[in-house]
């Protein structure tokens, strides 16, 4: 069976549901597909189809994630829902599902709970830029003042973690009522909260800048010299575009970036005028010897990324079952940090008052690398020990 072609007619946005266990994330996800399916803009996915999400592996970590897609009049969405709390933590830290915005589901009957807090904090740490709130199960609360109270609590919690709590849109409704309704009319009253939510998502979560429009960056995977022509570096363009004749910087492993000009670009042995995000290319560099550039450095638009050695990061430590360590590690632990295409040794400093880090923990730490790497906030990495992955992290702040 031939695969359907992905028609890129509408802007694309990645979103996901976050929130405490049993507050209705998966029910809401199913309800969204149901209501939009009635409008011909989605395929209905039942609760069970979403709940028994297939396992995926991202950076050596097994994560259960359900991916659903749907459209509104304005945009095309890819929506992620995870069955278990640990799956969310792993998903957000590894960047397996990069979210442009999140729908925070809070039960009006219970109010914010520990995982509500943890998911908001994680969203903040891994740079989920926008959150909208769905206040679920409002049919189970008789007193409107209680609903207002929960709403205030949610806004305060969002503000506490650096989101604009006062302006975050909050939609109230019952995902279960929408999911169980027999009505085939998309404008039935029980579907209104879902339509209102999608309207808010359309308007409040901006369309992200596409990778192509960002400044050029290509992690270097391999280096060769071509007799009579010079040095060629190969890799996959991560973002931006590069034209023949443009100046780039080689960043990493040296305190200062080094400038050079790309005098030729090739893909599949054919000459290109321009490389764009996603292309696997070879770039011919002017005046660079083969021993002056290596795997693990990046080619970048001048001035857009700098080499750093010290940063703060949010890290998930793999459990023994996931192939991670069997024992905790302590302050001063020195594993390898795998950034893009290479490993660099670094030393870990745990937060004050934290003695050790257990397998399965989610922890903030400071890392100091032995050599500088092209790093920016939001960059993902794996922590490895003897070739196996023992953790996954995301850079939250650069120190030096």
Swiss-Prot record:
Residues 19-26 are annotated as: G1. Residues 10-209 form the tr-type G domain. Residues 81-84 are annotated as: G3. One of its GO terms (cellular component) is cytosol. Monomer. It comes from the Bacteria. Mg(2+) binds at residue 26. Residues 136-139 are annotated as: G4. It holds the Pfam family GTP_EFTU_D3. It is found in: Cytoplasm. This is Elongation factor Tu.
